[in-house]
């Protein structure tokens, strides 16, 4: 499933339930790492905008980053997945932002103390970049998640690839443990992306250059820079 290529026509068909603008919302530029983040600024903004509880969470986030830099990759994945899954609540954009689809920065996500699957995935992605994991080993993956026997819903997870053609390990806000994709038969990959490109299904060949498009993702990056996280 995770290595099966899909056609461009199939991609368009799968995207219809998620909204016409969602593909553009994914294709933007992101640097290969988060360079020299100013987490002092991020922490100050958390206190100013959201209060002491948010600032305390940023302090804990910074501690996680500092203490995890030298760990093996598997431990980094587990600690980052656990940190956000335990500290942040899942809630819809309609409730949090009064919008149908809003992609939050890590600061906004921490500040509100809640977010949806995109927000969890983005925060984990950014954190793992800061921990030194290469962008070529990370992809945000849009999937159809099966609920029950027949119903599927749009969902996003983060995938870690030990090697570009390997089976990914999946970080999911709905699952406490990091599991290989082969153990997530409830997820059907539609496409995945990072700064280097866009992949359809579980394919290994990029179909697009994300640096050529504008999107919500670009807006997230702009807001991240203003908040002390410089891509």
Tell what function each PLM region has.
Residues 18-31:
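Bacterial N-terminal signal peptides
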Residues 1-15:
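N-terminal secretory signal peptides that target proteins for export/translocation
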Residues 2, 33-231:
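A structural boundary/capping signal
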């Amino acid at each position: 499933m995770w290595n099966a290529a899909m056609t461009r026509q199939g991609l368009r068909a799968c995207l219809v339930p998620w909204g016409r603008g969602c593909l553009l919302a994914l294709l933007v530029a992101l640097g290969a790492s988060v360079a020299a983040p100013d987490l002092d600024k991020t922490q100050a903004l958390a206190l100013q905008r959201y209060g002491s509880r948010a600032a305390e969470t940023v302090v804990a986030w910074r501690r996680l980053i500092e203490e995890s830099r030298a760990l093996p990759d598997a431990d980094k994945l587990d600690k980052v997945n656990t940190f956000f899954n335990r500290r942040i609540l899942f809630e819809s954009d309609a409730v949090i932002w009064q919008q149908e689809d809003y992609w939050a920065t890590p600061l906004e996500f921490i500040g509100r103390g809640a977010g949806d699957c995109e927000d969890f995935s983005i925060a984990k992605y950014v954190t793992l970049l800061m921990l030194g994991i290469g962008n070529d080993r990370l992809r945000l993956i849009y999937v159809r998640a099966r609920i029950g026997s027949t119903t599927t819903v749009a969902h996003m997870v983060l995938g870690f690839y030990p090697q570009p053609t390997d089976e990914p390990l999946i970080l999911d806000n709905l699952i406490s443990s990091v599991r290989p994709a082969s153990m997530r038969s409830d997820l059907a990959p539609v496409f995945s992306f990072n700064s280097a490109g866009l992949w359809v299904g579980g394919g290994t060949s990029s179909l697009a250059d994300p640096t050529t498009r504008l999107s919500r993702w670009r807006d997230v990056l702009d807001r991240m820079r203003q908040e002390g996280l410089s891509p």
